[in-house]
From Swiss-Prot:
GO terms for biological process: lipid A biosynthetic process. Belongs to the transferase hexapeptide repeat family. LpxA subfamily. GO terms for cellular component: cytoplasm; membrane. It catalyses: a (3R)-hydroxyacyl-[ACP] + UDP-N-acetyl-alpha-D-glucosamine = a UDP-3-O-[(3R)-3-hydroxyacyl]-N-acetyl-alpha-D-glucosamine + holo-[ACP]. GO terms for molecular function: acyl-[acyl-carrier-protein]-UDP-N-acetylglucosamine O-acyltransferase activity. NCBIfam families: lipid_A_lpxA, PRK05289.1. It comes from Rickettsia prowazekii (strain Madrid E). Its EC number is 2.3.1.129. This is Acyl-[acyl-carrier-protein]--UDP-N-acetylglucosamine O-acyltransferase. Homotrimer. InterPro entries: Acetyltransf_C, Acetyltransf_C_sf, Hexapep, Lipid_A_LpxA, Trimer_LpxA-like_sf. Pathway: Glycolipid biosynthesis; lipid IV(A) biosynthesis; lipid IV(A) from (3R)-3-hydroxytetradecanoyl-[acyl-carrier-protein] and UDP-N-acetyl-alpha-D-glucosamine: step 1/6.
Length: 264
């Protein structure tokens, strides 16, 4: 670690570990159990504390706070941690809080994500890769977000909710139910509007397969009869469509939340 990369006003506790070419800007505060991997850059006024690891090439902007204790009354100073992957862009005023005993003790963020101004990632969240969270997205505790999802600005997600891969949530959406992979949801109360067809096309999914998957989803959520029976019928009918299979697998997993449905 070169001292020339550390601003003289930064406060770095003894015990903090830095990789190669780490840059720490003015007035940053780094705790004693923080690990910053190669090429991490802290612009200024960044606070990183707790048992926290930041992956290589991640850039963190002013007034972000990473690794502080979870905002829960039952937190008892357990030694939980925050793990953030590589190549993330974490903009101003983002908060990522440590895990808790009730959630596996780790808040985990993947790679190649963009978290815009004011994003909050609560305790014990499991955040995937290649995500975009727009300004002031707020995630409560224990939320799982799959790869390539996009969450629009000022949206809030209820604790324990799952957000499926490649889905898109429109801005200002309160999300209190699971969002299926590829789902497109928005509203004052998030409802399913179809599949994220534009995003799927951009990611190289076959257009015909995507449209077939949309038909399958409509049969599941808008068809007649028992919901569980419809899932089984659609699974058999579209068993050769990998997108449908991925959605069916998601629907069959255990969850404490309901699913976002089409507006009736």
């Amino acid at each position: 670690m070169s001292n020339s990369n550390i601003h003289t006003t930064a406060i770095i506790a003894e015990g903090a570990k830095f990789g190669k070419n780490v840059k720490v800007g003015p007035y940053c505060i780094i705790g004693p159990e923080v690990v910053l991997h190669d090429n991490v850059e802290l612009k200024s006024h960044v606070v990183i504390d707790g048992i926290t690891e930041i992956g290589e090439n991640t850039v963190i902007y002013p007034f972000a706070s990473i690794g502080q204790p979870p905002q829960i009354l039952k937190y008892a100073n357990e030694r939980s941690s925050t793990i953030i992957g590589s190549n993330n862009t974490i903009r101003e005023y983002v908060t990522v809080q440590a895990g808790s005993k009730s959630g596996g003790m780790i808040t985990r963020v993947g790679n190649n994500n963009l978290f815009m101004v004011g994003v909050h990632i609560g305790h014990d969240c499991k955040i995937g890769n290649n995500l975009v969270f727009a300004n002031y997205v707020s995630l409560a505790g224990h939320i799982k977000v799959g790869d390539y999802a996009i969450i629009g600005g000022l949206s809030a997600v209820h604790q324990y909710t799952r957000i499926g891969e490649y889905s898109m949530i429109g801005g200002l959406s309160p999300v209190g139910a699971d969002v299926i992979p590829f789902g497109l949801v928005s509203s004052k109360r998030a409802v399913l509007e179809g599949l994220n067809l534009i995003g799927m096309n951009r990611k190289g999914f076959d257009k015909a397969d995507s449209l077939t998957a949309l038909n399958a989803v409509e049969e599941i959520f808008l068809g007649e009869g028992n919901f569980v029976d419809r899932i089984k019928q659609v699974a058999e009918k579209y068993k050769n469509n990998s997108i449908v299979t991925q959605i069916i697998d998601f629907l069959n997993q255990d969850s404490s939340r309901a699913f976002c449905h089409f507006k009736k």
